[in-house]
Every structure is written in structure tokens, then in C-alpha cells.
Amino acid sequence: MPLIRTPRTLPRVLSPGEVDALAGALRTHRDRAMVAAMLLGGLRRCEVLGLRLEDVNTGERRLFLAEGKGGRQRVVPVSGRFFASLGAYLEHERPATAATTRVFVVLKGARRGAPLSASGVDEIFDGARARAGLVRATCHQLRHTCFTRLREAGMALEAIQAQAGHASIDSTRIYLHLANDWLEKEYLRAAEAIEAQAAGPADGAMQ
């Protein structure tokens, strides 16, 4: 008896307006750097929190991710906007007295200088969502938004797999389904080429 495949729920992708609203609601360079790491680099929340100062290669604009999912390590490029926010955070906000090598730390209160926790990131997102008037905007949605936009821009699926840290390319293929605008443009471009080839020189001419 054949198995019935259960449809997989596609992860939600943030619209450009939602991204702008969320970015505008962030209050610190630290928070902007964390969001940029997820939105522009596709990092998971745990990978952002696991970053250490020695993992940051500013000259080559790369990050070494030592604490990826499943224990897999990788080096990924991230855009200059992330490094600009990161530089501002390290120069102006990160306490010089912080005893940890973790990049992202608590900025205020009794735990000032201690590594930022997952619950701390969630609290930051809750506040930013409320100020932006958004119902949903999660760390994982930022990651999915990153890879969807990269695919729409023409990035090869194998390259996205490497950037995302997926063990199997099957996990990456979901971005073929998410990139609806990209798919439509690719189809229309190909269809127009086929139609042009199929049309004869006298096609549509008066007989």
C-alpha cells in the first residue's frame, strides 16, 4: 500500500516592509548586528550566540561557526552591513570589562558583560516586534528570509546548502518552493524564449 505524503508546511518569509519595520525598531548596534547576522548571513540563533571574538575575520568578512547544528563547523561570508553594525557595537557598546570571549553580551544590569542567552534574544525580539507593530518575526524566519532572497537572486542551491550548514541538500530544496517571485520570473523568461523559437517567420502575417 503506497504511503501518503504529508504536505510540508513552508516556513514563513518576512516581506521587505516587515524587515524594514523590525530593523527600525532595534535600539542598539548589538541588536542590529545580531539581526544582520541572521538576515544577511543566515545564521541560526544558537550560532549567533556561540560566536567568539576570535571567530570574526573582519578583513575577509567571514565568520567561523564552531557551534553549528549537529556539531558541524563551517566558515561563512557575511555582508559588509553586518560588519559595520558589529564594529559599532564592539567599539561603543560592548563592555571592555566583559570576562567572556563571546561576541554578544548583556549591556545593562547585574549581568552586564555576561554572555547573552537565548531567552535574552527572545526578549529583544519581543520588544522590537511590539514597537514595530508586527505579529510575527522570529530568528528562524530571518534565516529563512535570507536564503529565500539569495535563491531569488540566483545563488546556486549547493552554495546555499554550504552557507546554511545543511547536512543534506534535501533540506535546502525547500527554498525552491519559497522563492515564488524568482520561480515566476524564471518561467516567464524561459517561456518567452520558447515562444520566440516556436513562432515562424510568417506567424501572424496576412496570407
PLM ranges: what are they?
Residues 7, 12, 16-45, 70-72, ...:
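Basic, Lys/Arg- and aromatic-enriched nucleic-acid-binding interface segment
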Residues 32-46, 62-64, 148-149, 191:
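Short pre-functional
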Residues 37-39, 86-89, 103-105, 125, ...:
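Short, structured motif recognition centered on aromatic/hydrophobic residues
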Residues 76, 122-162:
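Short, basic (Lys/Arg/His-rich) helix/loop patches that form interaction surfaces
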Residues 80-134, 200:
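Active-site/catalytic core of tyrosine-dependent DNA strand-transfer enzymes
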Residues 190-207:
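C-terminal secondary-structure termini that scaffold catalytic or DNA-interacting sites
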